[in-house]
Every structure is written in structure tokens, then in C-alpha cells.
Amino acid sequence: MARRRVAPCRPRSDESPERAADPAAARAAAVALLARRDLPSGELRERLDSRGFAPQATAEALSALASEGALNDERYAHNYVAYQAGRGKGPVRITADLRARGLPQELIEAALAAGVDWRAQAAAARVRRFGRSSPATLREKARQARFLQYRGFSADHIRAATGADPDTD
């Protein structure tokens, strides 16, 4: 019978409660999680809490990692925006994703304002999906607008990408 492997940083139910209250153990678990991928502080706190670490130990571990520069929500937000914009996602969808990950609105707005031309991104997403030709019919224009809206672009970005004029449509 195969034994179930338990991650070394996860406190087991039969372990002592001192380990769950130990900031060093919480820090080791946080470093192990951050080694896999960058996480915002809110999501890292949730993961440490779900692994049974005491809130005080979690707070101490997160503050130590933040002071060392290993945990930086601003860096995470900028990297996330750049990555998702490169995948053709718009600012509305990216904002919703970052809010769900627990980032403050000020960081989200700063990351979205940092050098991405959202109109050009919307146009590029439209061209990748539908080709270079402009939508010929109102039905095709609406189809492309729905696609861009699903991707998270605002109405202004969609109008610019589809060449729609609100006065003539």
C-alpha cells in the first residue's frame, strides 16, 4: 500500500501546536509557496491559514518577507498586468482578477496605468481573432464587440478597435 506524501511545510494534525505558532515554520512554508510562483500577500496569508498556521505567526512571516523584498504586492500587480495584457486581456477583467486576489484598488490602478496602451491591445486582440478587415455588418461588429467585452475591454476601447462611431451606429 502506497503512503500518502505530505508536503514538508504543511503542519499535520498530529504535529505539535507549537509548530503552527512558530513564525520560522510559517516563514519556511511561505518561502516554499513563493518558490513555486509569485503570490500577493493576501493570497499567501490565506494559504498559510489553510495550512494551520496561527495568525500571529503568519503575520510575522509575511512582514519579514516583505521587509526582505521577497513579498511585494506592487511588483506582483505590475507583473500580472503585463502578463495578462500580453495574453489579450483588458483592464476590466484584469481589475476583477486582481481584486479577487486581494490587492488594494490603489495598487491595481497604478499597475494598469503603467505604460499599456489599452486601445492598441484591444485592436490587436480583435485582429488576432477576426483578421485585419473591418467588420462589414452591424451583426459582425456586435460579435466582435462581445468578444472584446468578454476579454475585459471597456466600451471606449471596443469602439476604437472596431472602428465604431457611436453617432452613426
Residue ranges and their predicted role:
Residues 1-169:
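An alpha-helical, amphipathic repeat domain used for nucleic-acid recognition
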